[in-house]
């Protein structure tokens, strides 16, 4: 954990990811990357020179019309003293039954991102933290190079002017292992 925290501190410092007074929405899917991100940001909050707030947000895709069970994430957030919001969506219904997308991943990703941005803004957040790590960056770089014949990757910090919110990726120096 110390190694991960050290790398997150370095990324936060190198890219100026967190400023005093930030309210950061942490996108929490329930997977290992987003849960590690939440844990590490809670640890960082304890001793970071800049004071900031965290809110964990999960988008409930409502697979087959059923609400998801996020009780374990809720329990974790309660232990860390982090506000937890589950945002119900109809994404599964829209993509699977209404749009009948043959390759839904790209559309679903964009729609999830939009809902996450809107939810974060509704909660008064000025930043959104995502769990993309170093291996994700390398994979994105290679996919862009091989599929689109371009050199590029996501930025560790991205300001979205249309939404007036900043995306941060504090795990960008952390290997997946």
Task: Pin down the residues of each PLM region.
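ATP-dependent adenylation/nucleotidyltransferase module used to activate substrates
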Residues: 1-143, 147-150, 155-156
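Conserved, surface-exposed functional patches that form binding/active-site neighborhoods
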Residues: 143, 176-177
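Short, flexible loop segments at boundaries between secondary-structure elements
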Residues: 153-176
């Amino acid at each position: 954990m110390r190694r991960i925290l050290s790398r997150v501190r370095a990324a936060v410092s190198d890219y100026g990811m967190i400023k005093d007074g930030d309210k950061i929405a942490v996108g929490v899917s329930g997977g290992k990357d987003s849960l590690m991100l939440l844990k590490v940001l809670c640890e960082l909050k304890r001793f970071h020179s800049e004071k900031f707030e965290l809110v964990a947000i999960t988008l409930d895709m409502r697979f087959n019309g059923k609400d998801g069970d996020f009780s374990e994430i809720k329990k974790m957030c309660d232990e860390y003293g982090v506000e937890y919001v589950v945002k119900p969506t109809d994404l599964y219904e829209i993509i699977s039954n209404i749009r009948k997308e043959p390759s839904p991943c790209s559309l679903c990703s964009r729609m999830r991102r939009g809902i996450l941005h809107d939810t974060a803004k509704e909660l008064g957040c000025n930043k959104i933290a995502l769990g993309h790590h170093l291996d994700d960056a390398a994979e994105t770089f290679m996919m862009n190079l091989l599929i689109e014949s371009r050199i590029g990757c996501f930025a560790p910090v991205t300001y979205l002017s249309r939404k007036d919110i900043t995306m941060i990726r504090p795990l960008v120096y952390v290997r997946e292992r």
